[in-house]
UniProtKB/Swiss-Prot annotation:
Source organism per UniProt: Paraburkholderia xenovorans (strain LB400)
ATP-grasp domain mapped to chain residues: 123-318
UniProt-annotated binding residues for Mg(2+): 277, 289
One function term, GO molecular function aspect: phosphoribosylglycinamide formyltransferase activity
Protein name from the UniProt record: Formate-dependent phosphoribosylglycinamide formyltransferase
């Protein structure tokens, strides 16, 4: 496939085929963006009827950590591009697939290997690139965890080296918290490696996501780096509950944020959109994490930017030009399931959409849990404060109910 030169017709011999590994709500939006550009999309997830399965040309259910199953599916479908949307993937097999020339992995197989767990990316950022981070240590046992805590001090955060959306994370304020945190981390890891990172607290004012796009510059034909306006967000127990764009920052803090984002994404390489998470206090910036894919806090870009993070990702991976301009101040607010049940319904949708400048995305997840993210309310306003108020009002109007 000639990147950026031609796109074929879906379901024909000329098709440009993209396989998404992970078909949740973020993957669903990437699929829609790709399909609008005429791409044939294959969605893969670990459970049937995932949000992205519902809109893809073809859907498959496999254990993506199973190297043989992953290789067999790639050989069956023959995608031109493989786009990982989650961490729980046999990344060593992706590297083998890429080196064998079966498909191009986005952004690169190496990037997926480094970012699949917190250890790889933290060591790259802090030890190789010299970026400012919180103090940290890694532990393979309860005794090592205690030693790590002695190094970084209380309060601290313990996380599995491989998990997502806050799973397995604990805040520790004293010795009594250590053993429960270890047990919780072991239960919360996506792939149970029995290894955790312990991070010292940073006294920050706010957190941001700096969406960073590595895309072909049409003027030079080479990869350039583009930045979206910074996204502010609130997290509870490691899960994002609302986000807004733009986040006000000092000029120096913004400059430093983009320097950090540029360094870490350049080190990862390839094309695509990256979500770089940073802590900020005054003019000071610390690197937290990076995802080589659209970020949940970036759902706000569905209303705030000319092109959403999903459209930017689609364009970048296809070698097409990008435009990261802001359209209006915007905000997103999460809609939780509120109950444990399959096939729930939603009431209050009309009331939510009656909020000025508001919109909804109901993800279509087949099963609800009390704290599962089932949708998001979006809104724009004259200011981010107005947008946040509207998004929260719209989210509060939606009521998940039993369909029984």
């Amino acid at each position: 496939m000639q990147i950026g030169q031609r796109i074929g017709t879906p379901l024909s011999e000329s098709a440009t085929r993209v396989m998404l590994l992970g078909a949740g709500e973020l993957g669903k939006e990437v699929i829609i963006a790709l399909q609008r550009l005429g791409v044939e999309v294959i969605a893969v997830d670990r459970y049937p009827n995932a949000p992205g399965h519902q809109v893809a040309h073809r859907a498959h259910v496999i254990d993506m950590t199973d190297r043989a199953a992953l290789r067999a599916l790639v050989e069956q479908e023959r995608p031109h591009l493989i786009v990982p949307e989650i961490e729980a993937i046999a990344t060593d097999e992706l590297a083998a697939i890429e080196s064998a020339g079966l498909a191009e992995v986005i952004p690169t197989a190496r990037a997926t290997q480094l970012t699949m767990n917190r250890e790889g990316i933290r060591r790259l950022a802090a030890e190789e690139l010299g970026l400012p981070t919180s103090p940290y240590a890694f532990a393979d046992s309860l005794d090592e965890l205690r030693a790590g805590i002695a190094k970084v001090g209380y309060p601290c955060v313990v996380k599995p080296v491989m998990s997502s959306s806050g799973k397995g994370q604990s805040v520790l304020r004293g010795d009594a918290d250590v053993e429960p945190a270890w047990q919780y981390a072991m239960a919360g890891g996506r792939v149970n490696h029995g290894r955790v990172i312990v991070e010292g607290f940073i006294d920050f004012e706010y957190e941001i996501t700096q969406l960073t796009v590595r895309a072909i510059n049409p003027a030079s034909g080479e990869v350039s780096t583009y930045f979206c306006d910074p996204i502010g967000h609130v997290q509870v127990a490691g899960d994002y509950v609302e986000s807004w764009q733009p986040q006000p920052m000092s000029p120096l803090a913004l400059e430093r944020s983009r320097e950090v984002a540029h360094k870490v994404t350049a080190a990862l390489g390839g094309r695509g959109l990256f979500g770089v998470e940073l802590f900020v206090r005054g003019d000071d910036v610390w690197f937290s994490e990076v995802s080589p894919r659209p970020h949940d806090t970036g759902l706000v870009t569905l209303c705030s930017q000319r092109f959403s993070e999903f459209e930017l990702h689609a364009r970048a991976i296809l070698g097409l030009p990008v435009d990261t301009s802001l359209r209006a101040p915007g905000a997103s607010a999460v809609i939780y399931g509120g109950l444990d049940e399959a096939g729930i319904a939603f009431e209050g949708v009309a009331a939510a959409l009656a909020v000025p400048n508001a919109d909804l995305r109901l993800f279509g997840k087949p099963e609800s849990f009390v704290k599962r993210r089932m949708g998001v309310a979006l809104a724009t306003g004259e200011t981010t404060d107005e947008a946040r108020s509207r998004a929260k009002q719209a989210a509060a109007a939606v009521r998940p109910v039993s369909a029984k």
